[in-house]
Amino acid sequence: MDYHWRGELGSWRLLLLLLLLAAWKVGSGQLHYSVPEEAKHGTFVGRIAQDLGLELAELVPRLFRVASKRHRDLLEVSLQNGILFVNSRIDREELCGRSAECSIHLEVIVDRPLQVFHVDVEVKDVNDNPPVFRVKDQKLFVSESRMPDSRFPLEGASDADVGANSVLTYRLSSHDYFMLDVNSKNDENKLVELVLRKSLDREDAPAHHLFLTATDGGKPELTGTVQLLVTVLDVNDNAPTFEQSEYEVRIFENADNGTTVIKLNASDPDEGANGAISYSFNSLVETMVIDHFSIDRNTGEIVIRGNLDFEQENLYKILIDATDKGHPPMAGHCTVLVRILDKNDNVPEIALTSLSLPVREDAQFGTVIALISVNDLDSGANGQVTCSLMPHVPFKLVSTFKNYYSLVLDSALDRERVSAYELVVTARDGGSPSLWATASLSVEVADVNDNAPAFAQPEYTVFVKENNPPGCHIFTVSARDADAQENALVSYSLVERRVGERSLSSYISVHTESGKVYALQPLDHEELELLQFQVSARDAGVPPLGSNVTLQVFVLDENDNAPALLEPRVGGTGGAASKLVPRSVGAGHVVAKVRAVDADSGYNAWLSYELQPAASSPRIPFRVGLYTGEISTTRVLDEADSPRHRLLVLVKDHGEPALTATATVLVSLVESGQAPKASSRQSAGVLGPEAALVDVNVYLIIAICAVSSLLVLTLLLYTALRCSALPTEGGCRAGKPTLVCSSAVGSWSYSQQQPQRVCSGEGPPKTDLMAFSPCLPPDLGSVDVGEEQDLNVDHGLKPRQPNPDWRYSASLRAGMHSSVHLEEAGILRAGPGGPDQQWPTVSSATPEPEAGEVSPPVGAGVNSNSWTFKYGPGNPKQSGPGELPDKFIIPGSPAIISIRQEPTNSQIDKSDFITFGKKEETKKKKKKKKGNKTQEKKEKGNSTTDNSDQ
């Protein structure tokens, strides 16, 4: 019963031990196998795939592979069945020497995901090596005087096997004088000695032959034999002796050459030469002992003569002979065991494997970049290695197993900020002082298309003169992409939209690669003042990224339109207009008025009127207003004046070069009583067509009055709707930007005749544009312009589309009065509440100024149907027409243009003003006021006749 219970207890203990062993294997993440040495090729070792939990089908797709640093070809894994087998002959003695433990360390690596498993294959020893003696014959010299029980050390045999296979037993052949004694302190250090049984007698037996046999503990047993030749010496019967038979010394491996290991002392009771002792290494010592140590023959001092290395050999067994000088000499023996102590003299080694480079900048955290293994040949704390990574990098080291690390991604990457990392891995051991080694690893960051092309500014302003040649280069856009390679290749394109009735691409094109913007056709300022569009920049990445930039192209005016006459019209007799003037009229009486318009703007549309001198009538009593075009008398007519005058009026703009038109007016002088009759005869005869035209003008004036009333009502309704309605997105529509010009005689505001278009892609039309004509007169004062600024347009104001009915027909434009007032019309406006320049209001009935007076610029391209509206309150401070404002303010721009010039005359000609926005008085109102005006003209004419230069 008791035996049965003990058996069950032993079984439980064995089962518990197996469970603990299995749990240790699982926790360590390492597989253990064993294989005997000298196994044949193909010998089964273990089902490694099954033990690792891997399916056979996934071995090839996951790139199942086995890696080993030194013994890669000894073992192999079949990818068909997942079995680890012997690939080539394994010799344990060659692999591990005399080490008690011998294992082959393997690394099993699989991808997707990357995993590393560690496998230890223990190589079991097989008794395949017999005991071996270093020499075939061992010679001994024994004095006959030696006492029984004298001992003579013998060189033992060595067995390359380990464990029980290397445990040796010795036996000596049968002999009367000698026996064998083995002193077994441990299995590694057995002292084999030949013991003298009884005293020798050289005369009886001068030599003895024995055989020493060594047998190992393997199954089956293997043996080795050496012959012992014992020579018996005579006379000197006392040998030197040591204090102890074995000495043990410990010394560090970094001890310098010449360092004393031990100083031996032997004694000999003999006297004289028989007592003189010399020390030497025994003839049986190994060569490596002689290479690393030396002994002084006289003193017995053992010193270091070569560099010691704990990693190569940590124990030296030195056999020392102390020999006297007798005849024959006698020797004493001892053994010195020198144990080498480890010193931290080996730098850790770093190995980088399984690099996954380059790394995409959008890689996830935890991505494995590389596998790192470290090793230190030292032992104990000197061989314990820790691995670290340089700070401030987006990577970290993760310990996966002893002396194995994974380099993983720890934070986000940005190639545009850092395109490559030079990592330094440091391995440091635990010695004192510690040693370290470094390894450099270059990690390149692969680009990902995560940056869109960017322009230097969101909007550009471009100025282009009209009538440009087709295909001319007007601007170049450039966008920069922070990415690399194809992700940074930028292509440009036009954001297509409609410009009125046509597509944008019919006006503008953009070069795909260079970003150059071309005008495909000549631009016309009178048709299109502002063209706003967008250019798109897109890279070649996947997916592509892009951005847009806005271009505002302002078309600058050129003097390409000559003045066009409205009145007098070409026709009648010889293309001239006929006027009848009573001889009784006084000075300043308006005889006729020449009306003309210019489709240009600015100075190019500023018209002036000149009366051409006639060769037949060098002294004519008429003059023409410089800016009004009114033909009036310069004095009271008398009988000496010619009854007929042919007046040539030259209409000229101020462009470079100036364009002109000529109007012819026939003036006939009649008596006051004969004027109605002459007029009737003229209407019935020669001037028949003019009479019909006069009747038409009457109807036109009536129609103008009606249309003017309707226009005022429409404007009021439009203003109310504009103030109450919310701003709407602007498109391409007819607009009339205010153009402010300056000259030597003042400043004026001008609105062009033709409906012009201001095209915008996203914002509202720009109504506050101020431009300056480049063709200023030479007498204009200096213009100081600040640094060139881009024209910034306020997008806050988004006026509604004007009523398309707010147009004049051709017949109405022909008959409208050309005198418009500048009353309450702002000349310079930079926005609501900004500077507002006003001019006095004068009527067309105001008499002509005296000679030498300077009139303000009027008629600058403004016809009779031009209207100018005032925004915001007027400035109570009014400058004279001959004065210039100190500064011109360009709305939406910090540029300020200063123009200052003293007027040429303190007096101001008020009769040459053109008033904007005023309707022409009807003939009925003129007739009612004619009497008063005639009286005023006579009074003023009498005072100005002497000063007139016409």
Curated annotation (Swiss-Prot):
Keywords: Calcium, Cell adhesion, Cell membrane, Glycoprotein, Membrane, Repeat, Signal, Transmembrane, Transmembrane helix
A Pfam family hit: Cadherin_tail
Keyword flag Transmembrane: yes
Region (Disordered): 830-950
Any single Gene Ontology cellular-component annotation: plasma membrane
Entry annotated with the keyword Signal: yes
Intervals holding PXXP repeats: 774-777, 799-802, 832-835, 873-876, 891-894
Signal peptide range in chain numbering: 1-29
MF annotations from Gene Ontology: calcium ion binding
Protein topology in the membrane: Single-pass type I membrane protein
Residues in compartment: Cytoplasmic: 719-950
Residue ranges of domain Cadherin in the record: 30-133, 157-242, 243-350, 351-455, 456-565, 581-678
GO BP terms in the entry: cell adhesion; homophilic cell adhesion via plasma membrane adhesion molecules; nervous system development
UniProt subcellular location: Cell membrane
Stretches for region 5 X 4 AA repeats of P-X-X-P: 774-894
TM regions (residue ranges): 698-718
Residues on Extracellular side: 30-697
Glycan-carrying positions: N257, N265, N548
Top-level taxon of the source organism: Eukaryota
CDD domains named among the record's database cross-references: Cadherin_repeat
Biased composition (Basic and acidic residues): 909-923
Gene3D superfamilies, sorted: Cadherins
Role description: Potential calcium-dependent cell-adhesion protein. May be involved in the establishment and maintenance of specific neuronal connections in the brain.
Protein known as: Protocadherin alpha-8
Native organism: Homo sapiens
Phylogenetic classification of the source organism: Eukaryota, Metazoa, Chordata, Craniata, Vertebrata
